[in-house]
């Protein structure tokens, strides 16, 4: 049926252009219709994206599928080129799945400037889907930067008391990293033109450029810093707690579920295949594993002393992303697949936790853990949803959190057992900071009169949480369909890392001579 509709030829364009059309539709409509229009547009995008699960065929190998390319800026060799592999497939699905749930979760929260807010949410979806589906480096950078604008305004306008500070900090951190990446992109483009006579930003063309080990190391640093800030990993994480605490609930959901994944996706998409000699250099591997482990342990201990439930969950993101980083730089199939599964599980579970904390805030107008107690007695379904999601975040067997962390640790233990032992302690620390919060909020004595008035989940809230909880359990029980789709692409990335050899001086000289001869013939 999908082939009869020529689904592969237009779907990725639709997933980008439909929310963009929705953005203008929301701005044009009446204020009281904005949230419903945004929800409808995002649901249409999600329903269309579901077909990607069947359209992508892992039997065809780990390369890009559903590709399409349109000329954009021909003089620079820039194309509007889109495609998916077994890595980006899940990031696109996570983005389209999370956006309508975040929008639906905002209905009781966003009261002012609704048209602007929901237009920005749809524009944010345009950016994140574009980041994960672009196969042209210039186009990737455009979408990467585009996501910065709507999130800045979402935090700065609809956030908490310190929203302006948090928004500016978020903007400056990520913009600085992006500028370094831009320098790296321009350098790669210039080297491709000088060495191969290629004027193209297409991934497949740029991968052919014979960069020296020194060039790869410097470019790795430029790209790695940009993505490390976006993840964020220790010590570039300080913008994240402020952004999460001050952002409105739907902003926190999208930030945790999707935007942070842009950084770790960048690690896999660019650092490993584009700069393989740097990526597998022992000093680089040691540095990245060390930063990942420090992030896991440090974030766990800081989370354990947080009085604010939302800030506690914000620090869990730093810990989970630490697991992703060590999985990626284990440089083996188990570690890389585990890191990708942690990305997916974290996106769903942490997004759900922020929604649940937002629901508690709507009822009690506080996020301080000490102000709660005994909520499970008056709101049993709310308590049940929170407990399940917290257990997923900890990594309980039978949930998506366990599968990802298990594979990650398995991959790390293969090559770096010392790092694996330290990282395993992070699983224990996760229980140390998460379970006391659950105990304090839901199962301590029901003493405060305000807590007796807390209502249970509404139908709208059940509709939001049910698919998230179901997906976390389904992935935990039966992860094979996900692993089968991502494994060929993971294998292809790792083959590129280990097959790469430093280009000899003779090779570079011969390439340059051929380029000069070609230019002379043309003249």
What are these regions (language model features)?
Residues 116-123, 127-215, 229, 302-315, ...:
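Alpha-helical multi-pass transmembrane bundles of energy-transducing inner-membrane proteins
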Residues 234, 350-353, 421-453:
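Predominantly late transmembrane helices and immediately cytosolic-facing juxtamembrane segments
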Residues 1-11, 25-119, 199-208, 492:
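Transmembrane helix-loop-helix hairpins at membrane boundaries of multipass inner-membrane proteins
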């Amino acid at each position: 049926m999908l082939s009869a509709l020529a689904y592969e030829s237009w779907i990725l364009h639709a997933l980008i252009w439909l929310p963009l059309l929705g953005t203008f539709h929301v701005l044009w409509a009446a204020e009281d219709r904005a949230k419903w229009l945004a929800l409808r547009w995002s649901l249409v995008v999600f329903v269309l994206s579901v077909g990607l699960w069947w359209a992508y065929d892992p039997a065809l190998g780990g390369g890009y599928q559903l590709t399409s390319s349109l000329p954009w800026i021909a003089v620079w060799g820039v194309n509007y080129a889109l495609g998916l592999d077994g890595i980006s497939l899940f990031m696109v699905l996570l983005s389209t799945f999370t956006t309508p749930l975040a929008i639906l979760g905002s209905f009781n929260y966003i009261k002012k400037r609704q048209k602007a807010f929901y237009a920005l949410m749809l524009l944010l979806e345009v950016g994140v889907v574009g980041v994960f589906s672009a196969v042209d480096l210039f186009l990737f950078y455009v979408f990467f930067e585009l996501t910065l604008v709507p999130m800045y305004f979402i935090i700065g306008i609809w956030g908490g008391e310190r929203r302006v500070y948090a928004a500016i900090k978020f903007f400056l951190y990520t913009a600085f990293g992006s500028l370094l990446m831009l320098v790296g992109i321009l350098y790669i483009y210039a080297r491709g033109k000088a060495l191969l006579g290629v004027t193209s930003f297409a991934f497949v063309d740029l991968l052919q450029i014979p960069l020296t080990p020194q060039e790869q190391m410097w470019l790795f640093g430029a790209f790695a810093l940009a993505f490390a800030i976006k993840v964020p990993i220790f010590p570039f994480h300080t913008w994240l707690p402020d952004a999460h605490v001050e952002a409105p609930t739907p902003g926190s959901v999208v930030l945790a579920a999707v935007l942070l994944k842009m950084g770790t996706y960048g690690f896999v998409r660019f650092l490993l295949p584009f700069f393989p000699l740097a990526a597998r250099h022992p000093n680089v591997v040691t540095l990245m594993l060390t930063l990942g482990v420090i992030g896991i342990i440090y974030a766990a201990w800081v989370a354990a002393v947080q009085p604010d439930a939302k800030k506690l969950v914000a620090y869990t993101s730093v810990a989970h992303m630490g697991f992703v980083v060590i999985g990626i730089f284990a440089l083996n199939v188990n570690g890389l697949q585990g890191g990708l599964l942690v990305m997916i599980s974290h996106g769903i579970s942490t997004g759900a936790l922020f929604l649940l904390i937002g629901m508690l805030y709507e009822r009690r107008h506080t996020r301080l853990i000490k102000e709660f107690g005994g909520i499970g007695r008056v709101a049993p379904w709310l308590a049940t949803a929170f407990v399940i999601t917290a257990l997923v975040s900890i990594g309980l067997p039978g949930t998506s959190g366990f599968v990802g962390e298990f594979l990650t640790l398995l991959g790390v233990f293969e090559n770096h057992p010392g790092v694996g032992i330290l990282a395993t302690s992070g699983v224990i620390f996760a229980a140390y900071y998460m379970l006391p919060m659950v105990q304090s909020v839901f199962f301590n004595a029901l003493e405060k009169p305000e807590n007796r008035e807390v209502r249970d989940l509404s139908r709208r809230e059940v509709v939001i949480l049910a698919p998230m909880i179901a997906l976390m359990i389904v992935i935990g029980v039966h992860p094979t369909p996900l692993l089968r789709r991502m494994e060929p692409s993971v294998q292809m990335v790792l083959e590129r890392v280990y097959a790469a050899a430093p280009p000899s001086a003779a090779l570079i000289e011969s390439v340059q001579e051929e380029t000069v001869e070609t230019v002379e013939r043309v003249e």
